[in-house]
């Protein structure tokens, strides 16, 4: 069990709702496929139009006694109308979508120190604010236990610091001779974040407590009692 000191904090779960590069790639591939399929359909429609260019047209529609073919034509018309409406709606949404906040630069000069007193270890994290920080900026301190190979051994815990002027924090009630990975993030808005590079730290070995109430009753040249 461990605790976080110096300021009031909240343990939070973190979900990044920003665009990722793989999301851009997926959207681009989907749109290219839609455009390609649309061109293929346009070619089919052109070919059908050429076939029936001299056919019996009444009110702009082909008079056909083939029920299956008539059903096919109606199905194409309905699906194309649905596709047109869906793409128009998506364009409208994208045009009115609010811009995502830009991630602030990460905190700088992050320093991690550890101590062990009375068989209890603690870690103190210090940092400098990012250059030109945005308004209403907050910090997050990420903390996770690791093994000697740097592999994560438990879930990552995130502490939120709501006061942007607070640039020092402590994590207490840790185990001596244990390894941890720490990083600090500067957060703007709901999810936009710039995080520092992670730092590994090992808590010191047990340091015996100071002996108290030492009394000297008598002494000679060679003995002390």
From Swiss-Prot:
One Pfam match: fn3
Cellular component terms (Gene Ontology): extracellular region
Domain Fibronectin type-III: 106-206
Entry's localization field: Secreted
Keywords: Secreted, Signal
InterPro entries hit by this protein: FN3_dom (IPR003961), FN3_sf (IPR036116), Ig-like_fold (IPR013783)
Residues in the signal sequence: 1-17
Tissue expression: Component of the organic matrix of calcified shell layers like nacre and prisms.
Protein name as catalogued: Fibronectin type III domain-containing protein
Species this protein is from: Mytilus californianus
Lineage: Eukaryota, Metazoa, Spiralia, Lophotrochozoa, Mollusca
């Amino acid at each position: 069990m461990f605790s976080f000191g110096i300021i009031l904090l909240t343990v939070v779960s973190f979900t990044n709702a920003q665009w990722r590069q793989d999301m851009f790639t997926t959207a681009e591939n989907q749109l290219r496929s839609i455009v390609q399929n649309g061109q293929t359909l346009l070619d089919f429609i052109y070919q059908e139009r050429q076939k029936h260019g001299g056919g019996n047209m009444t009110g702009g529609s082909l008079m056909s006694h083939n029920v299956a073919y008539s059903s096919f034509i109606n199905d194409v018309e309905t699906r194309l109308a649905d596709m047109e409406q869906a793409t128009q709606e998506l364009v409208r949404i994208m045009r009115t979508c609010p811009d995502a906040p830009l991630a602030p630069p990460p905190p700088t000069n992050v320093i991690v120190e550890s101590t062990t007193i009375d068989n209890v270890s603690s870690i103190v994290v210090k940092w400098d604010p990012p250059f030109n920080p945005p308004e209403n900026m907050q910090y997050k301190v990420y903390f996770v236990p690791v093994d000697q190979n740097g592999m994560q051994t438990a879930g990552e815990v995130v502490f939120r610091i709501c006061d942007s002027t607070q640039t020092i924090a402590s994590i207490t009630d840790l185990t001596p001779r244990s390894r941890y990975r720490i990083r600090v993030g500067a957060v703007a808005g709901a999810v936009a974040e710039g995080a520092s590079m992670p730092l590994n730290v090992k808590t010191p070995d047990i340091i015996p407590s100071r002996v108290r109430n030492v009394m000297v009753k008598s002494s000679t040249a060679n003995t002390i009692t």
